[in-house]
Amino acid sequence: LSIRRQRQMCIRDSFYTLHRGLYDIAETRLNTILVDLNAEWFKSMFGEGPENTIVVASLCNGPGNYAFNGITKGEKRGIVIGCSTDKEGNPAYSRFLITVIVHELLHHYTNPCLAQYWSQIDSASQIIYPHVKEKMAKLAYGSTNSTMIEWFNNLLTIMYFKDNPNRGFTATHLTAWRQHEGFIWMERSMTFMEHFRNHRNLYSTIKDFMPEIVSFVNYTASDFDNVLKEYDNKEPYITDIFPISNSILPLGIDTIQIRFSKPMFGAYGIRPLDDKRISPPYTDYQPFWKDKYTFCIILDRSKLEKGKTYGFKLNRAFFQSEKTYPMKEDFPYTFKMPDE
């Protein structure tokens, strides 16, 4: 070792010793999440498990996470997992972190697979990338290569959770999330990967299926106009509303009915309008879903002033289709009470 390297290691070891208590807490808490990891799944998909991969609990990297390879031959590969803190200032981890751990572990498998076949999908990737470039930039994926690497890794991450369901999120939800981020061909990708799942007698591992994945990418690029149309049609929108927004509330009507273009997930979120002059129509009645398409808000006319305008907005994030695609934007709604 060089003097500089020895000094770096000395400083590192001293820092670790000084903060050993915090690292012990981090290790214990992170292990409560890692215990749910299905290592056998990695072996079944790639022919090799993650046993030789180390997980580093980083307290100096903020919430950032990344995968790394050993610098010299024989050094182990691994992933670095950042953390947040609890109210006592100790390392804290969300139960949703398992998605990040799986994602980072998979980079050690998916990156080499894609690199081996990159020359066969390069041209197709150049067709896809301009359509999603702006959204990818928001995710810090600034090139065609990084975009396709993350698409493939996200695809396998979703497949993991399809095979290993976890409370709080599903493969359907993760697919919609990635589509909304900009990987707008992810639902097609998941549909295509069913061919792999249904023909494991022919394809022992993902490596065996890579020629078919290459064909899928090339076909997707050639059909991307339809991919764009499909994505634009996935987001639910309002097809009917009564009474019509910005109208006078008819006498005898005490329920606002809002119908959507797709069967909905069943959640809702209602917020006041940004215009402080317009009050929400406060009511003791709970909104409800009349059916999978129709959302109802019951008004209490006795609490509403004559001639006054009321309003609210439907929060797009809560009004999701059954496939968990949210509305494209918030929907503002107002009505005016009759003067008499």
Residue ranges and their predicted role:
Residues 19-75, 268, 273:
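Auxiliary, metal-adjacent structural segments of Zn-dependent hydrolase domains
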Residues 113-180:
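Post-HExxH zinc-binding segment in Zn-dependent metallohydrolases
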Residues 1-7, 11:
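Single conserved hydrophobic/aromatic residue that forms the stacking wall/gate
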Residues 157-239:
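Pan-zinc metallopeptidase signature
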Residues 95-116:
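Active-site recognition of the HExxH zinc-binding catalytic motif
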Residues 65-95:
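Active-site scaffold of zinc-dependent metalloenzymes
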Residues 24-32, 88, 96, 138-144, ...:
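Second-shell loop/turn segments in exported
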Residues 230-340:
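Acidic, low-complexity Ser/Thr/Gly/Pro-rich repeat segments typical of extracellular/periplasmic
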